[in-house]
Amino acid sequence: MSEMTPREIASELDRFIIGQDKAKRAVAIALRNRWRRMQLDEALRHEVTPKNILMIGPTGVGKTEIARRLAKLANAPFIKVEATKFTEVGYVGKEVDSIIRDLTDSAVKMVRSQAIEKNRYRAEEMAEERILDVLIPPAKNNWGVTESASSSEPSAARQAFRKKLREGQLDDKEIEIELAATPMGVEIMAPPGMEEMTNQLQSMFQNLAGQKQKARKMKIKEAFKLIVEEEAAKLVNPEELKQQAIDAVEQHGIVFIDEVDKICKRGGQSSGPDVSREGVQRDLLPLVEGCTVSTKHGMVKTDHILFIASGAFQVSSPSDLIPELQGRLPIRVELQALTAEDFERILTEPNASLTKQYQALMATEGVSINFSQDGIRKIAESAWRVNETTENIGARRLHTVLERLMEEISYDASERQGETILIDAEYVKQHLDELVADEDLSRFIL
């Protein structure tokens, strides 16, 4: 779990996301409160529930990007889902309980990779010994029993091979080694809502097959990686990992629900059953409030999982959500539409900005691209103008505009090796102005 302060979390998000300081502050405080809660006495800790967040803002302003970056910072079980993928229990489609099952699966994977990484050094030593046993088989006596290497001669040979192995001199040598056979996958088609039963049947068939060894021929470099994974897996206790993963989900889990505005009931609709809108909201209530969900790894309580919902709310408003769900999302954060100045900063400030990406891509062909300050300003203004005159899709418009601008260079790059191309205001005007000015053309092309 991350121990960063709210200010550190916000400044880390600043490296990738421009503006939206209110949203950054809200998620930074929420993430820090997870750590604060764990410092309390157990009796009080149980009473402190997370304050769930609702992010409201037009498309392309950074709602999903904040969630994506938060997942990397949190070092905690995290899942992002679209609310539109779910239907009410009893109807065809995914149930909302599958959110917690998927979150638990990702937690098991995360905890397992951490445990394997912790045991990697020991696993590498064991893998080294197994490869050396293949290269220099231990001597056997007349009864076929392996003797201990007591003489100095085999030991010296083994040490010489060990040195070569560590220096990479034997990487391309091919050996035959016994590795655990991959269990045969059993695909079971089941109706929606029966995923749990399907998982249990698949696990049962895999366990019936047992763990068999299979001789495989491969290069030492490749074999070493596979043996390290196999030996590291033997050093971890699966049951212990499952319990750690369930604890991590219950205490630190974060669920990001995108497109929550699409499950609002809009005015003037028929009064029939609304299984993919209001029905989904009703099913989300117990999850957000706190309930126990059955997963293949065990029972998971959702009382202390943090839920962050987001939506554009262009044709609906947060008040269109059912009142019970509104009450369970107490923190509201409004994200602002992006300006031309924001677009200019997006093109230059983030660690992997679009301009840096294009420069790196063209550098692979030996073409050097330079963006002048007035060129960047012109690109930002063009993108903003198209957003104003057509649909406002936020920062995603920059992808469209830049792709159009770079199309000619990308196509001819392999024939322009060694050239340096300056993209200034004049170049942008020449390639984009006609499209930007013509509203009908920009509607279909940009």
From Swiss-Prot:
Alphabetical keyword list: ATP-binding, Chaperone, Cytoplasm, Nucleotide-binding
A single GO cellular-component term on record: HslUV protease complex
Function comment: ATPase subunit of a proteasome-like degradation complex; this subunit has chaperone activity. The binding of ATP and its subsequent hydrolysis by HslU are essential for unfolding of protein substrates subsequently hydrolyzed by HslV. HslU recognizes the N-terminal part of its protein substrates and unfolds these before they are guided to HslV for hydrolysis.
Identification of the protein by name: ATP-dependent protease ATPase subunit HslU
PANTHER family to which the protein is assigned, alphabetical: ATP-DEPENDENT CLP PROTEASE ATP-BINDING SUBUNIT CLPX-LIKE, MITOCHONDRIAL-RELATED (PTHR48102), ATP-DEPENDENT PROTEASE ATPASE SUBUNIT HSLU (PTHR48102:SF3)
InterPro entries, A to Z: AAA+_ATPase, ATP-dep_Clp_protease_ClpX, ATPase_AAA_core, Clp_ATPase_C, HslU, P-loop_NTPase
SMART domains: AAA, ClpB_D2-small
Domain of life: Bacteria
Subunit structure: A double ring-shaped homohexamer of HslV is capped on each side by a ring-shaped HslU homohexamer. The assembly of the HslU/HslV complex is dependent on binding of ATP.
Keyword Chaperone attributed: yes
Disulfide bridge positions per record: none
Family annotation (Pfam families): AAA, AAA_2
Alphabetized CDD domains for the sequence: RecA-like_HslU
Primary location group: cytoplasm
Residues reported to bind ATP: 18, 60-65, 258, 324, 396
Subcellular location as annotated: Cytoplasm
Biological source species: Proteus mirabilis (strain HI4320)
